[in-house]
């Protein structure tokens, strides 16, 4: 869910050699981090990338405003101007009350974020622990966000107790939904 500073710096080093590549970061989970993870951005780690980096963020995750569809971007002026043109022709503005709430969320006290992250971390630890106890499932512990991305590779080619043959991650997800009532998204959906 997150790149360490060292991983991101290594990626920045590669990007510095390819000045035709633009960078777009999705920093929506900037504040939803765990285990002393240190958030960073390409433009911060490599100032030479600043002029070709667009940073996208919003209030959905850290401020529990999902569904409000409030976000913002920062980057080179010409790119932001182009975004404004596209946005003005493809969608209407966000409601004024949502905009006012977002301003208050961003400018108001931030002391609730740490307790929320503690709660998310406890849930993450429980889910990852339980997944890693399941036969055929392996799950790394993410350092940010509130999702996990377990591998079900150990279940492929096997037959479930009800006789269902599990050949793909989609088969596994369908089995979980139909037999256990658990809805998950297969990895194939993410490319």
Where are the language model's segments positioned?
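PLP-dependent class I/II
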Residues: 1-191
């Amino acid at each position: 869910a997150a790149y360490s500073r060292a991983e991101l710096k290594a990626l920045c080093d590669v990007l510095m050699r390819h000045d035709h590549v633009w960078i777009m970061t999705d920093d929506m989970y900037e504040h939803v981090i765990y285990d002393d993870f240190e958030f960073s951005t390409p433009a911060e780690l490599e100032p030479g990338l600043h002029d070709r980096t667009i940073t996208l963020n919003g209030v959905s995750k850290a401020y529990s405003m999902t569904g409000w569809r409030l976000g913002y971007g920062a980057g080179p002026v010409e790119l932001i101007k182009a975004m404004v043109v596209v946005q003005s022709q493809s969608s209407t503005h966000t409601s004024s009350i949502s905009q006012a709430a977002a301003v208050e969320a961003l400018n108001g006290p931030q002391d609730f974020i740490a307790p929320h992250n503690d709660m998310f971390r406890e849930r993450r630890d429980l889910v990852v622990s339980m997944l890693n106890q399941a036969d055929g499932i392996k799950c790394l512990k993410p350092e940010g966000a509130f999702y996990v991305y377990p591998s079900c590779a150990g279940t492929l080619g096997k037959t479930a107790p009800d006789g269902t043959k599990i050949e793909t991650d989609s088969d596994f997800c369908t089995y979980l939904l139909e037999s256990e009532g658990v809805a998950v998204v297969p990895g194939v959906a993410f490319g």
